A protein has these predicted regions:
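N-terminal exported-region signature
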Residues: 1-25, 30-44, 48-243
């Protein structure tokens, strides 16, 4: 734990003593809660601004990246990832699959248009086109996370799932804190739709599934928080005591 008293600070580290067999060495801020996970082999420090009287608690995880597999049907697929990818660039992730057509696309709800994707982020939904005649298995090494937060603007947005099915109507797992007027409703819980590539049709859903992307409608600016049951998450990683 770091006690700041409103002062900024910089957290530095060295992982030279950790055996190379552990390809996952990550750090995450658990208080205040955030979904951001940082690869400690890729960077050696984090900086935090001053002016906020906030105590920080960090969790360090040592283990191995898990492989998450997307099963992609021929045609357009609406997908998401369940964690922080080792390599976020779609061009690198899809390099061994010539039948996957770049770019991937996300939806910009403020511009009302699709945008090409340069990095995959947990919590976002993406359109991906496969020209293969059968199911393509796209394997993505990543750090599993059990929650994410993201801003949702009014209108339709593309969101994603986590490592296990989540009841979208359960306010303990899915919260949509309004930004601005707290009396205004935000996300409509019955507006969750996923895409069925085999049927070429949308299907209304009440659950967020792993690897799937979904359309959802919000009436207001809000902060969406989605949380999975951490007890049921299976991971070969070892969480060290919080510091």
């Amino acid at each position: 734990m770091v006690l700041t008293d409103g002062q900024g600070f910089r957290l530095r580290w060295s992982v030279s003593a950790i055996p190379d067999d552990f390809n996952l060495v990550s750090i995450q801020t658990v208080s205040p809660q955030t979904s951001a996970v940082y690869d400690m082999r890729q960077q050696q420090q984090l900086a935090f601004e001053s002016g906020i009287d906030q105590d920080y608690t960090f969790e360090i995880t040592i283990g191995h990246y898990q492989t998450f597999t997307l099963n992609l049907a021929p045609g357009w697929n609406l997908v998401s990832i369940t964690g922080i990818p080792k390599t976020p660039e779609p061009a690198v992730i899809a390099a061994d699959h010539p039948n996957l057509v770049l770019p991937f696309y996300s939806w910009d709800s403020t511009e009302y248009s699709y945008q090409p994707v340069t990095e995959l982020v947990v919590g976002q939904g993406y359109w991906l086109l496969s020209t293969g005649p059968a199911i393509t298995q796209l394997e993505i090494p990543l750090i599993q996370v059990n929650s994410y937060q993201r801003y949702i603007s009014p209108g339709w947005s593309l969101v994603g799932g986590l490592t296990q099915p989540i009841d979208f109507t359960d306010t303990a797992s899915v919260s949509d804190q309004p930004i601005g007027d707290p009396s205004v409703r935000s996300i409509l819980r019955n507006s969750l739709y996923n895409w069925q590539p085999n049927l070429y049709a949308y299907d209304r859903s009440s659950r967020l599934g792993p690897g799937k992307g979904y359309w959802v409608l919000s009436l207001n600016d809000c902060q969406l928080t989605v949380t999975a049951d951490a007890v049921n998450m299976l991971s070969p990683a070892i969480a060290l005591p919080s510091t």
